[in-house]
């Protein structure tokens, strides 16, 4: 490919609103251009990278016998209403009406459609296990699109779906997909951690995220140094090392605590450690009033709590509701005489505490010396706390380390979440009707490309992993009017293009312009044809090298083969 004919509008400086390095470099290098907030055009350089990533996916899916297909972008609302997700998905769904008033949506994912088109046509256990996938543009009405391709309103995604007659088949499919995904990320040069994750609005109970460590990441993962435990912070567990020595129960005492509306203020006012205080927070779970208790030095993990409550909507009570329901403003709510609560759930940290401070359900008042069972009851204990960095992990009891990361993939064991509600049954080997068991598998392809850039930055540009680099070799001719350089450049272009993707910079530009653009192209090998062309010598440089190396033309093939294969 001749660079003089290649549309690659580079920028000297990134726009001021581009925060992520990947966003800055993709704009500066002419990979993408913004059309509107969260929506991008993929220019030739960016599209080459995208297609190479898609080719890797196609090859690895072929290797596990999963065929590709394509579903429509425009979906009827009725399918999502049938599954119950039309309302649950929330404001991020692009909804529209046709001229006849029929409601539709732009697909953010396709579980319902695959259930309707595929699962409902699987009538016998003999047709399973089966898996299919597609690579297509998805739509999500992000409230704050940002970081370029990392959080957009339109993005390219691989989404795959599996169909099984038994749980054992689903487990095998899940493991096959996980293995294939790890190979995809490895070939794309993206370092990932498979971590325990929340299924969110997707349904099902078991899921694994693939998290790519990066400074710009919006997620946090908790891992140990041995790699035997890894979880998204939303789902991370840890061992609580605090132990309170048993005490004789003291008399319950009501005390005034004016203006003490935080744990820190209350602990200082009462001269007690935060571990001797039990926080009480009122949640509204659908139409239930749930009082949640946790030790004062810990924070409630609302994702874990949501799993326990299993409600469509879980939120904290607002200020007016607090007073109306409990009789107290914030800071004074507590579990004693909390007959207004439909349920009381406590974190495990509350189990073995003695003579603690709890709210008195009266503004500016607390009880001291409250004791579980004697003074208040708990309906259910569960792990609903947020893990802290440095706490022991639950597997090897090693300190947890927190890392910011980018979610680039997510796989789910959906089970019968969709097939139950949408009526997709098959006949088992005994002739009995059963719901098809499903799995769902996704890679954010464009997000993966941004993660690759974030993990492969150079001082002035990108060092693309070789399998997704837009070009394997960037051939740069220093003086276009030098016939010796031109002859050698054209000879190398012809020879190398037979085996590799080659970009030949044949522009009549200054060397500084050419080298700056080459840093942004980020080809695994840069071959510069300069003043020593007459001696049969070129300069070879990898993106991470500080200086180029002179190589005789007779040795060039061996050097290239060593680097690129």
From Swiss-Prot:
A GO molecular-function descriptor: proline-tRNA ligase activity
Enzyme class: ligase
Pfam family of the protein (one): tRNA-synt_2b
Annotated compartments: Cytoplasm
Annotated catalysed reactions: tRNA(Pro) + L-proline + ATP = L-prolyl-tRNA(Pro) + AMP + diphosphate
Domain of life: Bacteria
BP terms from Gene Ontology: prolyl-tRNA aminoacylation
Gene3D superfamilies attached to this UniProt entry: Anticodon-binding domain, Bira Bifunctional Protein, Domain 2, YbaK/aminoacyl-tRNA synthetase-associated domain
Matching HAMAP family: Pro_tRNA_synth_type1
Role summary: Catalyzes the attachment of proline to tRNA(Pro) in a two-step reaction: proline is first activated by ATP to form Pro-AMP and then transferred to the acceptor end of tRNA(Pro). As ProRS can inadvertently accommodate and process non-cognate amino acids such as alanine and cysteine, to avoid such errors it has two additional distinct editing activities against alanine. One activity is designated as 'pretransfer' editing and involves the tRNA(Pro)-independent hydrolysis of activated Ala-AMP.
Family: Belongs to the class-II aminoacyl-tRNA synthetase family. ProS type 1 subfamily.
Subunit relationships: Homodimer.
Name the UniProt record assigns to this protein: Proline--tRNA ligase
Species of provenance: Lactobacillus johnsonii (strain CNCM I-12250 / La1 / NCC 533)
Higher taxonomy: Bacteria, Bacillati, Bacillota, Bacilli, Lactobacillales
């Amino acid at each position: 490919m001749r660079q003089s004919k290649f549309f690659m509008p580079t920028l000297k400086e990134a726009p001021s609103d581009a925060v992520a390095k990947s966003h800055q470099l993709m704009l500066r290098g002419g990979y993408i251009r913004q059309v509107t907030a969260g929506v991008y055009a993929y220019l030739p350089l960016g599209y080459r990278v995208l297609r190479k990533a898609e080719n890797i996916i196609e090859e690895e899916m072929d290797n596990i016998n999963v065929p590709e297909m394509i579903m429509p972008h425009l979906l009827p609302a009725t399918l999502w209403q049938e599954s119950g997700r039309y309302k649950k998905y929330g404001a991020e769904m692009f909804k529209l009406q046709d001229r006849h008033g029929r409601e539709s949506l732009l697909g953010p994912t396709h579980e319902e459609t695959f259930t309707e088109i595929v699962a409902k046509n699987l009538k016998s256990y003999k047709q399973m296990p089966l898996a299919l996938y597609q690579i297509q543009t998805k739509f999500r009405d992000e409230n704050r699109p940002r970081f370029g391709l990392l959080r957009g309103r339109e993005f390219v995604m691989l989404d795959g779906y599996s169909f099984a007659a038994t749980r054992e088949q689903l487990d095998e499919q899940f493991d096959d997909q996980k293995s294939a995904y790890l190979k995809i990320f490895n070939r794309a040069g993206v370092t990932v951690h498979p971590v325990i994750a929340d299924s969110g609005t997707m349904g099902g109970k078991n899921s694994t995220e693939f998290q790519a460590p990066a400074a710009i990441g919006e997620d946090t993962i908790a891992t140990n140094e041995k790699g035997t435990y890894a979880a998204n912070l939303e789902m991370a567990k840890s061992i609580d090392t605090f132990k309170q020595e048993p005490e004789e129960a003291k008399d319950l005492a009501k005390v005034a605590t004016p203006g003490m509306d935080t744990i820190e203020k209350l602990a200082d006012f009462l001269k007690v450690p935060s571990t001797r205080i039990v926080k009480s927070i009122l949640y509204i779970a659908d139409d239930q009033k749930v009082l949640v208790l946790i030790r004062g030095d810990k924070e409630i993990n609302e994702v874990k709590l949501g799993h326990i409550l299993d409600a469509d909507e879980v939120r904290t009570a607002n200020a007016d509701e607090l007073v109306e329901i409990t009789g107290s403003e914030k800071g004074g709510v507590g579990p004693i005489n909390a007959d207004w609560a439909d349920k009381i759930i406590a974190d495990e940290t509350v189990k073995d505490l003695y003579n603690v401070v709890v709210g008195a359900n009266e503004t500016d008042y607390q009880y001291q010396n409250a004791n579980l069972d004697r003074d208040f009851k708990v309906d259910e204990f569960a792990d609903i706390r947020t893990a802290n960095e440095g706490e022991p992990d639950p597997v090897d009891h090693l300190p947890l380390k927190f890392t910011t990361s980018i979610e680039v993939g997510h796989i789910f064991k959906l089970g019968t979440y969709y097939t139950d509600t949408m009526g997709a049954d098959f006949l088992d080997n005994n002739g009995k009707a059963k719901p098809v068991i499903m799995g769902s598998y996704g890679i954010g392809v464009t997000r993966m490309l941004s993660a690759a850039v974030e993990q492969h930055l150079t001082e002035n540009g990108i060092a693309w992993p070789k399998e997704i680099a837009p070009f394997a070799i960037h051939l740069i001719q220093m003086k276009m009017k030098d016939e010796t350089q031109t002859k050698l450049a054209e000879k190398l272009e012809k020879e190398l293009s037979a085996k590799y993707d080659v970009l030949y910079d044949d522009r009549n530009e200054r060397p500084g312009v050419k080298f700056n653009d080459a840093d942004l192209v980020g080809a695994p090998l840069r071959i510069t044809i300069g003043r020593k062309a007459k001696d049969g010598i070129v300069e070879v440089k990898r993106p991470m090298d500080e200086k180029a190396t002179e190589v005789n033309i007779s040795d060039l093939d061996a050097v290239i083969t060593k680097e690129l294969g």
